[in-house]
C-alpha cells in the first residue's frame, strides 16, 4: 500500500456496501445488508496509512463511515434499531438520486460551515451511520433527527466526510466541496514535489532520550515521534539527534560522568542507525546530500548541553572527532561555559543579587570553548543560553552560530525565546534560528498551541530576520509537537501551510 500511496495525491472514498461489523468488534445485526470483505480490508488499511502520509481524503456515505471506523470512531449498523426512541427521517430515499430530500445544519465555526453555509439541502441513501466520530474527527453536520451528516479532522489533516452523495447533485454546494478537495490534492502534490527535489532538515530532535524504552527506529514506533517511517511520510531528509544532558552537579566527578553519558548516548545512536537499512549517519552537508541522492535518510549527532565538556577543553575536539555537528552551550541551569536563560534553583540561591546570573554571559572558559568550536568546525548553538551569553558568543565567534530550537519572544514571552533584536543580530552575523514546536514556546496558554501558532512564529521570524536565517528545530521527542505538527510524519503539512502563505520553492 505504501508503494501505491507514493503515487497518490488524494483519495476519494465512495459509497457502497455496509462495513462488516466484525472489523469494529461487533456482531452483525439482523438488518445488516451486503458486505464486501476485500474492500473493507483494503480501505481500512489504506485509510490508516494515508492518514500517516497526510494524504487528503474525502469520504462519501460509506466513505465517511469507514473513515470513522478506521480512525477510532463507531458506527450504527442500523439506525432504526440503534435509536428506537427517535423519529428518524427517511434516510434511504425513493426520490431520484439528484433530488434533495432533507436539510443538514452545519456548525458555524466548522470549515464545512464556512465553505457551504449554515444550512444545505442533501440527498440520502443509507441505513448505517456514524455513531461516534472518535477523537480524530469532529461531527460538524447534523440532520434534524440528530444523525451525523458531516465530520472533519480535529488534527489539521485534509480529511472530510459527508453522509450524502454530492456527486449526484448538480449544484454549487457540491461543486464547492469537490473544488476544495481537488485544491487540497494539488497542495499536497506541490509539497510532495518540493520534498522530492529539495533537502529538508530538522535541527533538533531528542529521540535518544527514549533509548531506555527499547525503541525501534526501523519501524513505525508509537513511543517516539521520529523514526525512519515517520521521516519518510513527512518528507524529512535529515534530523540532528542530540545527546541530552540535564544540568547536575559541577564537581569533577559529575563532569566525568556527564562526558561518559554523552559518549554512551552517541554509541547507541550510531548503533541505532547502523541497524536501519533506510538511514545513514552524516557529519557534513555533503554527506546529507549524498545520502538523499542514494535514497537514505540522514541522522546527524549533536550534544545538548556543554556540560559534556566539563572543564576540559580537549573534549571539544574529542566530540568533533566523533562527528558532533553542534553543541548547545548550556541547558536549564548555568554551567562552566555560560549563563543559562533559565538558571536553576541552586544558581538563584548562589547568586541572588543577579537572579541566578553567574558569569554575566560567557565565562573565560566559555570564550575558549567557542574559539575551539570554531577551530574544529563544530557549530555553536545558543538555544537555552541567556541573552548575555547570546551577545557574548556572537562577539567571540568567528563563524555564524545557530539557535537550534527557539521561537519568537514577541509572540510568546518566554525566556527561552528570541527577541526581534536577537533575531536581527543573528541574521547580521550570518546565523540561523530554528523555530521550535514546543507548546510553551508558542503560546503562553500552551494547552491551546497548534500548527497555526508554529506558522505564525515562523512567518514573524522570517519577516524580522529574513528567510535565509530561519529553519525548523522541532524538539520532537523532547516535548515538542502540537496538533497539526505532532510527529515527523506531519512536517509535509507545514510545507503546505508555508507554501499557502506565499513562500516559494527557493524560500523553503
PLM regions: where:
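Short glycine-rich anion-binding loops that position phosphate/pyrophosphate groups of nucleotides
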Residues: 16-19
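Glycine/threonine-rich flexible loop motifs
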Residues: 21-36, 412
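Gly/Ala-rich beta-loop-alpha elbow adjacent to hydrolase catalytic centers
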Residues: 59, 63, 68, 72
Amino acid at each position: 500500500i505504501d508503494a501505491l500511496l507514493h503515487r497518490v495525491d488524494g483519495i476519494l472514498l465512495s459509497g457502497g456496501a455496509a462495513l462488516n461489523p466484525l472489523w469494529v468488534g461487533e456482531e452483525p445485526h439482523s438488518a445488516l445488508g451486503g458486505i464486501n470483505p476485500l474492500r473493507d480490508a483494503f480501505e481500512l488499511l489504506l485509510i490508516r496509512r494515508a492518514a500517516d502520509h497526510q494524504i487528503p481524503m474525502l469520504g462519501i456515505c460509506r466513505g465517511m463511515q469507514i473513515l470513522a471506523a478506521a480512525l477510532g470512531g463507531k458506527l450504527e449498523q442500523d439506525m432504526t434499531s440503534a435509536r428506537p426512541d427517535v423519529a428518524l427521517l427517511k434516510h434511504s430515499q425513493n426520490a431520484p438520486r439528484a433530488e434533495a430530500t432533507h436539510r443538514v445544519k452545519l456548525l458555524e465555526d466548522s470549515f464545512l460551515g464556512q465553505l457551504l453555509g449554515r444550512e444545505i439541502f442533501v440527498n440520502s441513501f443509507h441505513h448505517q451511520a456514524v455513531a461516534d466520530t472518535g477523537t480524530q474527527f469532529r461531527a460538524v453536520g447534523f440532520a434534524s433527527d440528530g444523525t451525523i451528516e458531516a465530520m472533519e479532522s480535529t488534527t489539521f489533516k485534509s480529511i472530510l466526510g459527508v453522509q450524502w452523495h454530492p456527486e449526484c447533485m448538480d449544484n454549487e454546494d457540491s461543486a464547492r466541496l469537490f473544488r476544495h478537495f481537488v485544491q487540497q490534492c494539488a497542495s499536497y502534490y506541490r509539497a510532495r514535489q518540493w520534498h522530492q527535489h529539495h533537502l529538508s532538515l530538522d535541527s533538533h530532535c531528542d529521540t535518544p532520550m527514549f533509548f531506555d524504552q527499547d525503541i525501534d527506529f526501523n519501524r513505525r514506533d508509537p513511543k517516539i515521534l521520529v523514526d525512519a517511517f515517520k521521516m519518510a511520510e513527512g518528507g524529512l531528509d535529515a534530523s540532528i539527534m542530540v545527546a541530552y544532558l540535564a544540568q547536575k552537579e559541577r564537581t569533577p566527578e559529575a563532569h566525568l560522568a556527564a562526558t561518559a553519558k554523552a559518549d554512551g548516548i552517541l554509541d547507541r545512536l550510531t548503533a541505532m542507525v547502523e541497524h536501519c537499512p533506510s538511514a545513514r549517519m552524516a557529519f557534513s552537508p555533503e554527506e546529507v546530500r549524498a545520502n538523499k541522492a542514494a535514497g537514505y535518510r540522514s541522522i546527524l549527532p549533536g550534544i545538548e548541553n556543554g556540560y559534556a565538556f566539563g572543564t576540559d577543553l580537549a573534549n571539544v575536539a574529542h566530540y568533533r572527532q566523533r562527528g558532533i555537528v553542534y553543541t548547545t552551550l548550556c541547558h536549564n541551569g548555568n554551567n562552566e561555559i555560560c549563563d543559562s536563560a533559565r538558571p536553576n534553583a541552586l544558581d538563584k540561591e548562589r547568586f541572588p543579587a543577579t537572579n541566578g546570573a553567574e558569569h554575566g554571559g560567557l565565562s573565560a572558559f566559555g570564550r575558549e570553548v567557542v574559539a575551539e568550536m570554531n577551530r574544529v568546525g563544530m557549530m555553536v548553538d545558543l538555544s537555552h543560553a541567556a541573552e548575555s551569553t547570546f551577545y557574548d558568543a556572537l562577539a567571540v565567534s568567528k563563524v555564524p552560530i545557530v539557535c537550534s530550537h527557539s521561537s519568537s519572544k514577541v509572540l510568546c514571552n518566554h525566556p527561552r525565546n528570541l527577541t526581534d533584536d536577537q533575531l536581527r543580530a543573528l541574521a547580521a552575523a550570518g546565523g540561523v534560528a530554528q523555530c521550535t514546536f514546543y507548546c510553551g514556546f508558542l503560546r503562553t496558554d500552551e494547552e491551546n498551541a497548534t500548527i497555526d501558532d508554529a506558522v505564525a512564529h515562523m512567518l514573524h521570524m522570517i519577516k524580522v530576520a529574513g528567510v535565509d536565517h530561519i529553519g525548523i528545530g522541532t524538539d520532537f521527542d523532547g516535548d515538542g509537537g502540537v496538533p497539526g505538527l505532532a510527529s515527523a510524519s506531519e512536517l509535509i503539512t507545514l510545507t503546505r501551510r508555508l507554501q499557502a502563505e506565499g513562500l516559494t520553492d527557493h524560500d523553503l
